[in-house]
Amino acid sequence: MYNLSRIIYRFSSVSLNPSTRASGFLLENASSKILQSATNRAFSAKSGSDGVGGDDNGWNISTGGSFGGTGSADLDWDNKSMWSTGLTKEHFDGVSVGRQKNAANPSSDNTPSDSGDVMSKLGPKEVALVNEMNEYDDLLKEIEQDNRQGRAFVDGIKQRMMEISVLLKQVKEPGARGSYLKDSEKTEMYRLHKENPEVYTIERLAKDYRIMRQRVHAILFLKEDEEEEERKLGRPLDDSVDRLLDEYPEFFISHDREFHVASLNYKPDFKVMPEGWDGTIKDMDEVHYEISKKEDDMLYEEFVRRFEFNKMKWRGEVMCHKYSRRRSSEGWKITVEKLGAKGKRGAGGGWKFMSLPDGSSRPLNEMEKVYVKRETPLRRRSIISTEVMRYSPANQKRRSKRKQKRKERRIACLKAGKQT
């Protein structure tokens, strides 16, 4: 409002005719379109030859006669009038004063634009007024931009609060970072991996979509199977359920422990350090993370190995029915392991080969190598989550037995106390 009042004051000071003052003009024309057009124009303080209206431009044609016989030379009809509307020739030639809008490819080799010519003809007061109007336009644009940014910030508060709640949930419960993926996101994941598997690897997709690597393997396999089924049928599959879950994800609230968290026995572990020992110890959270990461890698390798074997069963390469173990007409094929140095087996020395019924031998093929690898025991303790251990049937039975024994001991103690 302060800038607007300054512009009105400058308009009223520029025009010499009271009927053409800017205040009356703005009151009579209150629309925003006229106000904008008025701010893009400059008014001349005089209509004389001050650099705007020259003697040969046709605006200062003298007229004959005298004025009222007063004897004053200034009021003769031959002299130019001092009364002016504040309008110059440029206002009627259609040349805008100030900035050019929709300028079409200005070139530095061409002559200066019409706006530059008009600005060069204006006096210092008019140039200052035009610059002030341009500053006012810039101020309005900045205010509109700030309003748009503020509106976008206010509209995105709900989404940011939901993201913060998810992050707080992750901090409160480590490992619970799984979220429901839409079918469109799974399709996009499969498309990226199919087009460029070297760039969009399993690890990168798991990191981008914030899910487990095992889950990425399963999604890619299912999407590949869907594509194969569509190719066989010649039409797309029914995805009504997937589209329903995509449109209404609140119906399906997923809560998966996407990252393995190791269960540690939090008990003191005192060690006697040598004299003069000046070292540091690791933080408990750091140790917990390292153990969890190591166990997660072990579980991932085991999952991939079992998943590849299950895919072979899916394709029919592994026969597990009751007729697959019958003796063929040629005879049995026997797997023989040759012991190494000092009777060592496995990686320590021995190697396996296949003995055929005719007495010959051959090395193991790929499928037989998979069988041999699956027979190798895992040299590690079983990784079981705390919740599974707590509520497993075996633990429940042991707990009930211990509870019954404690009850029997209490009853025996009470009986012994009464007898004494």
Curated annotation (Swiss-Prot):
> Which stretches does UniProt call biased (Polar residues)?
102-114
Q: What does this protein do?
A: Essential for fertility (male and female gametophyte functions and development). Required for the integrity of female gametic mitochondria. Modulates male gametophyte functions, including pollen tube growth and style penetration. Involved in mitochondrial-driven cell-to-cell communication in embryo sacs during female gametes maturation (including embryogenesis initiation and endosperm development), especially for reciprocal signaling between central and egg cells which regulates reciprocal development.
On the tree of life, the source organism's domain of life is: Eukaryota
* One CC-aspect GO term: ribonucleoprotein complex
Question: Which protein, by its recorded name, is this?
Answer: Small ribosomal subunit protein mS75
Q: Which intervals of the chain are annotated as region Disordered?
A: 99-120, 390-420
Q: Which GO terms describe its biological process?
A: cell communication; embryo development ending in seed dormancy; endosperm cellularization; endosperm development; gametophyte development; mitochondrial membrane organization; nucleus localization; pollen development
One family from Pfam that matches here is Bot1p
Subunit structure of this entry?
Component of the mitochondrial ribosome small subunit.
Q: Does the keyword Cytoplasm apply?
A: no
Compartments where located:
Mitochondrion
Gene null: resulting phenotype = Irregular structure and reduced number of cristae in female gametic mitochondria. Completely disrupted male gametophyte functioning (shortened pollen tubes leading to altered style penetration) and impaired female gametes final maturation of the egg and central cells (persistent antipodal cells in embryo sacs, as well as small and short egg cells), not required for double fertilization, but essential for embryogenesis initiation and endosperm development, thus leading to the presence of aborted seeds in siliques.
Q: In which tissues is it expressed?
A: Expressed at high levels in reproductive organs and, at lower levels, ubiquitously.
Q: Where is the composition biased (Basic residues)?
A: 396-409
Q: Which residues form the signal peptide?
A: none
User: Which controlled-vocabulary keywords does the entry list?
Assistant: Developmental protein, Mitochondrion, Ribonucleoprotein, Ribosomal protein, Transit peptide
Task: Give the InterPro entries listed for this entry.
Answer: GCD1_mitochondrial (IPR052851)
The chain's transit peptide is found over: 1-11
